[in-house]
Structure formats: C-alpha cells, structure tokens
C-alpha cells in the first residue's frame, strides 16, 4: 500500500508512535512561526525552558497583528520579541513586512518540511507542499527547543479536483465549496489532501488560499502536491534550490474521497455567521452593501490584488460603500506600487491599509451598526469584526471588487470576459525588513527588553485527587476562541498580560463571567458541540486557567483548543451521553471524585451534580503522554519535570 503526501512527510519526520489512525505520534519540526498576538507568550514560555538557542532549521517571528499602536503595550511587546529573536536564533519580520503566512509562503516555505505556527492559519504552507499545522504557543516553544510536536494520527481525505475554473470563479470559491460539503467540524481529526488534474490549473497562491481555509474545516492541516507549478513559484522567488517534488503514490489509500469539478463551480459567499453557511452569489445579488475589505492571509497575494486592480481600473467605488485593501506583504505592496496597480486602486476610491492582518482580527475597519460587509477573509464569526451586529460575508476578491463598484452584491461573471493575469516570472525580492539573529558568539551580550505590560505565565499546580467546583458558565454549540478570548484593538494589546486580559474572558457571552469565576476561585465550564473552534490562541485556555477553571465539560472539542487546554492543565471532558448536557445548570455544584485515579487508569471520569444528585459519565480522551501532562499540571511543568 502506498502513501499519501501527508503520510510521506509524517513518515520522514516521525520520532515516536505508530502511523495508525487515532494513535499519538510525535513529529520532528523543521520550521516554526509566531505572530505577535500569540508570540509574546510563546517566547516567555521558551525562556522558561532555559534553552539558549532554537534547534529548528528556521524559526521566524512576524509582527502583523498588533500594528495599531494606540498605547505603549504593542511597541513594548514588539521590542521584547525582537530582542528575544536576536538572542535566541530566531529571524524577526518587522511590522510592515507583511502577514506571517503570506511572507512565509514567499520567502521561507519549503516542500516536504514540517512547520508549526502559533496561528491557526499556518496550514497556508500546505499550498507549497509543507505539512503546516496551527498550534498553541507552548507547543511552538517546545518545538523551538528541539522537542517533538504531538498530534493524533489523522485520517486522510482526498479532494479530487477535475476540470478548470470558469472565468471569474476563484480559489476562494473552491474552498467555500469544500466547506459547504464538509462543514466547520467535518475536518476534525483529518488531513485534507488535494489531487487530480485540476490541481495543475492552480497557482501556488491559489492553492495556499485553499489550504489556509482548511482551518475552517477543523482539519489538522491541508496539503497540495509539490510539482512544476511549485518549482516555478520558488524560482520566481529566487529559491529554486528549495524545490522538492512531492506527490501521493498511485496506490495511496484515503479514508474519504470528495469529488469537485472546478468547471461546475460558481461564485459563492459564506453568509453570517459561519464559514460553512455558503450560498451562491446569484442568490444574494442586488442586496445593498456597506463595506468591502480585501486582504488577509487568505486573499492578499499579488495575483489576487492584480485581479482586483484590473476590476477597479477606471471605475469608482459606490457612494454607499467603504472599500479597504491591505496587501499581504511588502513584496506585493511594492510590486503593485511599481506597476501602477496601486494607483488604479487609489483612483477608484480604495483606502489602502498597511500589510498586516488589520480588519480580519477586528483591528480597525469595523463596519457600521448592522452593516453588511463583504470580506475576502476566512472567518465571519459574530462580533469578530468589532461590530457586535455586523453582517459579515466571506467572498472572493473578484466578487468583493465588483460589488464595491456597484454598491450591491454582484456576480463578477456579469463583467463579461476576464483578463488573463499572469504570475510574474520574477518577484521583487527585498528582505531588508527581516532581521537576522545574533551569532552564537554575540548572543550572550544581547539584552532582553521587557515592558511593564509583560507578565509571567499563570501559576499551575498538579492535578488533585478530587475536584469540587461550581459551574461558572454554560454555553451552546460552536463556541469559538473569539467568544472565549475576544480580539480587537482594545483587547489584543493585553495578550502579554494574562491577569489583565482575563477580565475580558467570555464577556461576549456573559459579561459577569470573569468576576464570577474569580469570586468562586475554582469552577467548571459546560458547553456544546465543537467547543473552541477557530483561532489557535492559547489565551483562550490561559485566561480560564488564571480565573480558576479546572475542567471544561462539553459535547465535543475543536482540535487546537483541546490541546491548549491540556497544555494549561485544564481537564478536557466530553459527555458520554450528549443529553446529559441538560442535567447541569449555571451555579450547580459539581464534583469529580477520585478524578486523578480515574485519569491515570483510563478515559472514564465520573461527574456528580451535588445540586441535583445526578451522576454524569464523561470521557477524558488522552494519550499516555497527555495524561502525564494533565497530572503534572500542564505542559510547562511536565517539560521541566522531564528535561
């Protein structure tokens, strides 16, 4: 039996465990990336391990989230990250150089390599043939120190692409079509691998758009083959020596196969408030819109923005629409400026933003009250835009641009013939905003710069034999990490300060939660299906940890968040019988008698509702390793004990 692309990379990097679905496996990590909203905590964690210099082939820290410097906090954090990078062997991408995933694809990604990043959209690297996985900051810190990264061996899904996209239909429409089929939880425990003749018709940036939004499927990662198209992209980036051919064996076996005929696809939109709430644009056509935002790590490549510039050239943005455009990298921005495309955008009435995440994370450009905003981004969770009742639709750059001109939802196919936008034979290469680390000889003299906003990792303690705690919060299905730990311009600057940021934990769902949890001292959260979907932010585990949350009892978890809870020493419990969710109310006193002994011996955990007298059976699905992490009180304590 042959291997899939992902299985080949896993086999090459396997350091422990067997490649059997459901088994815990450890992987050697070649590259890491961080962004600044999660990076400060990752580097605080790395420092705590006491390892002088990173042991990866390449580690890069990007500044792309907290670029709105309305106070000292962000600038201080950036100085801290830059000094840590200088001292410990990490490359530093300065603010303005671009969004981490776009820049990493351009300048550092290598086919066949493993990459983990403290950002859930790290699978963007799958567009170039990497096994690229989003992870919590502590997992990234451990990998930088030379430790293995552990995952549950996933199932393999093949998405077989046939045909060719019609004019005005884009890669964004492909991944929206996949989301329509699989849903936001259909990829959990799976790697999505793209193959078929249709793959050859897609450029590397188009492939990266698709793997980027594999995160919205809940997938471990997504990956494309590395082929002649990959070689041409790397050659144009001056990195042809990084090319390696990578494809699935003809006799590779997949657990699931999805067929998509590219010729049959049409322009699509993900409607509020979920990326899998997908409808054809033709069903929305004519509805008035208020705002259009083009950019993000999903759709900010040179190819995307050249297509946008072509649509906007000689036109005017509708009076009722605000159009904002953020190029994904300095490389893209500079090339658009030199070839005149940037001028066409500005002349049409676009507001040009810096090369950063910006509106995608609620960092500026929030729409008006109940405003309808078309965005080329990857998430449209309620409130994520910064406007609580904003109506966010996820669309392609082509749909976004033509709708901005007309002021209403518009199918781009109404424009007629589409211009052929070619990939450049050579990209503009200027890495002067990537700062190299100090040499081994110089690193001891580098001083770490810490601002007053930077606080220590929250205190943890080993698992006790029994837990008795109140239910401090009860929430429903599809709770996102944006619900747990909101982002935006006011809260993101606090990411280095767990005590302060904890004051905002779950306030989207219940404004009283932080104070209630703090008063209780220790508590348990109860939730529904797919709890913790979305961003990889470990702050969604660290803030509850700081507030005394000992366990989270839900119907099911999203992958990264469950891992982050384990890393923080918080028990991730699931109902054996989902109907038992109704047996717990806010304020009920819950007891986990003998939980330490139960965890040590297997998955079964007993939960007694002392308020009602009900006994509830729960599962705590852990490997031998994660069981030891929970008992130790979290990954940091476990790592110290075993180093």
What are these regions (language model features)?
Residues 1-643:
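Fe-S-dependent hydro-lyases/dehydratases of central metabolism
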């Amino acid at each position: 039996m042959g291997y899939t692309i992902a299985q080949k990379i896993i086999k090459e990097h396997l350091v422990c465990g067997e490649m059997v679905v459901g088994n815990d496996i450890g992987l050697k990590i070649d590259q890491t990336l961080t962004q600044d909203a999660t990076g400060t905590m990752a580097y605080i964690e790395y420092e705590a391990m006491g390892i002088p210099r990173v042991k990866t082939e390449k580690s890069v820290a990007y500044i792309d989230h907290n670029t709105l410097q309305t106070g000292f906090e962000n600038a201080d954090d950036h100085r801290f990250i830059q000094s840590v990078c200088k001292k410990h062997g990490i490359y530093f991408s300065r603010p303005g150089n671009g969004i981490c995933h776009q820049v990493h694809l351009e300048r550092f990604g290598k086919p066949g390599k493993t990459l983990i990043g403290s950002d859930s959209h790290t699978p963007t690297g799958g567009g170039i043939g990497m096994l690229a996985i989003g992870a919590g900051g502590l997992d990234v810190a451990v990998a930088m120190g030379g430790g293995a990264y552990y995952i549950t061996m996933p199932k393999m899904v093949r998405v077989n692409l046939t045909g060719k996209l019609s004019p005005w239909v884009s890669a964004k429409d492909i991944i929206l079509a996949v989301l329509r089929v699989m849903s936001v939880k259909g990829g959990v425990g799976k790697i999505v691998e793209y193959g078929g003749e249709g793959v050859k018709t897609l450029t590397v940036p188009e492939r990266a758009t698709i793997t980027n939004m594999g995160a919205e499927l809940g997938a471990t990662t997504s990956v494309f083959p590395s082929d002649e198209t990959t070689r041409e992209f790397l050659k144009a980036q001056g990195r042809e020596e990084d090319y390696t051919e990578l494809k699935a064996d003809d006799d590779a076996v997949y657990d699931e196969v999805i067929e998509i005929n590219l010729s049959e696809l049409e322009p699509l939109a993900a409607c509020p408030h979920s990326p899998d709430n997908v409808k054809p644009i033709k069903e929305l056509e004519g509805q008035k819109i208020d705002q259009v935002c083009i950019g993000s790590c999903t759709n900010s490549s040179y190819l995307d923005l050249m297509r946008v510039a072509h649509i906007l050239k000689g036109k005017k943005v509708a009076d009722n629409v605000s159009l904002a455009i953020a190029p994904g990298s300095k490389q893209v921005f500079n090339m658009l400026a030199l070839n005149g495309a940037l001028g066409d955008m500005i002349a049409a009435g676009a507001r040009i933003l810096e090369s950063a995440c910006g509106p995608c994370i609620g960092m500026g450009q929030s729409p008006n009250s109940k405003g309808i905003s078309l965005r080329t981004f990857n998430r449209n969770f309620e409130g994520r835009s910064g406007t609580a009742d904003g109506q966010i639709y996820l669309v392609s750059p082509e749909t976004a641009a033509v709708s901005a001109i007309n002021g209403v939802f518009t199918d781009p196919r109404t424009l007629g013939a589409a211009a052929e936008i070619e990939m450049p034979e050579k990209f503009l290469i200027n890495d002067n905003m990537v700062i190299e680390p100090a040499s081994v000889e110089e690193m001891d003299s580098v001083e770490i710069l810490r601002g007053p906003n930077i606080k220590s990792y929250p205190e943890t303690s080993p698992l006790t034999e029994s837990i008795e705690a109140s239910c401090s919060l009860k929430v429903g299905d599809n709770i996102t990490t944006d619900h747990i730990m909101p982002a935006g311009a006011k809260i993101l600057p606090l990411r280095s300060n767990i005590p302060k940021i904890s004051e905002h934990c779950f306030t989207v769902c219940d404004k009283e939660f932080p104070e209630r949890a703090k008063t209780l001292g220790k508590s348990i959260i109860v939730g529904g299906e797919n709890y913790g979907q979305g961003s990889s932010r470990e702050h969604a585990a660290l803030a509850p940890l700081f507030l005394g949350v000992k366990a989270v009892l839900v119907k099911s978890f999203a992958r990264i968040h469950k891992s982050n809870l384990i890393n923080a020493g918080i028990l991730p419990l699931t109902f054996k019988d989902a109907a038992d969710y109704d047996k717990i109310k806010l304020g009920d006193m819950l007891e986990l008698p003998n939980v330490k002994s139960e965890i040590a011996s297997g998955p079964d955990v007993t939960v007694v509702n002392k308020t009602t007298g009900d006994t509830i059976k729960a599962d705590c699905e852990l490997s031998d390793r994660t069981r030891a992490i929970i008992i130790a009180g979290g990954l940091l304590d476990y790592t110290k004990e075993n180093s």
